[in-house]
């Protein structure tokens, strides 16, 4: 991991729209970024075929957050959650299925 051990704050997906996301990517290693994209692609597939919820660990400007929700889609820059909220991919640390 690229961050010191930090306990994530569990939040509701409805508050994602209120969060602020800095520009730098939270992952510096190219292999970690590839793994993150693979996790996102799998989560989108499972979200659309089986409505599977996943745990998303991400960083906003205040620290590490966690939500459990369905990822309905992804662009090259953002994931789209079940509720229509979006999270920038460059701020996602991990997607756990």
Where are these regions (language model features)?
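Short glycine-rich, low-complexity segments
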Residues: 1-63, 95-97
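Short beta-strand-centered aromatic/proline hotspots
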Residues: 66-72
């Amino acid at each position: 991991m690229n961050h010191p051990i930090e306990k994530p704050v569990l939040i509701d997906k409805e508050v994602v729209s209120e969060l602020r996301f800095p520009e730098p990517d939270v992952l510096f290693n190219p292999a970690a970024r590839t793994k993150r994209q693979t996790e996102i692609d799998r989560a989108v597939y499972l979200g659309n075929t089986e409505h599977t919820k996943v745990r998303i660990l991400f960083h906003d400007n205040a620290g590490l957050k966690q939500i459990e929700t369905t990822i309905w889609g992804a662009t090259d820059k953002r994931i789209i959650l079940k509720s229509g909220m979006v999270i920038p991919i460059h701020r996602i640390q991990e997607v756990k299925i």
